[in-house]
């Protein structure tokens, strides 16, 4: 199987969410229809990340859901995840804790996690 990995990075606050959502939807639709299998790698650190995740979920539901996975990549084990693990697993297809960043100081963990996501991606948005 040909895996196509996509990472998303954006701002904590989004000024025009409807415009961003439409642009994301167009890209995600194209990927779902043209790639054998797509792995959508996302964080959970702001409005953009949440917008991406909800758009991927909606596109999977309305376009195609048999050739992709929505993967939350955490920089380290968080209290939010630990206290809500079941809810996280209901929302995301997979959850990964980046081993490289989990071993780093928390102030640099996001940067290390982001670099790891980029390194495993075929496309970065």
Predicted regions and their residues:
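Acidic/glycine-enriched connector segments
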Residues: 1-125
């Amino acid at each position: 199987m040909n895996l196509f990995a996509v990472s998303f990075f954006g701002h904590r606050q989004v000024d025009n969410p409807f415009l961003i959502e439409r642009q994301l939807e167009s890209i995600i639709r194209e990927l779902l229809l043209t790639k054998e299998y797509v792995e959508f790698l996302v964080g959970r650190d702001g409005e953009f990340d949440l917008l991406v995740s909800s758009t991927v979920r909606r596109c999977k539901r309305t376009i195609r859901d048999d050739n992709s996975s929505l993967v939350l990549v955490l920089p380290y084990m968080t209290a939010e995840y630990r206290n809500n693990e079941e809810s996280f697993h209901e929302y995301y297809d997979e959850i990964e804790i980046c081993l490289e960043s989990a071993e780093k100081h928390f102030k640099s963990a996001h940067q290390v996690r982001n670099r790891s996501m980029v390194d495993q991606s075929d496309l970065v948005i």
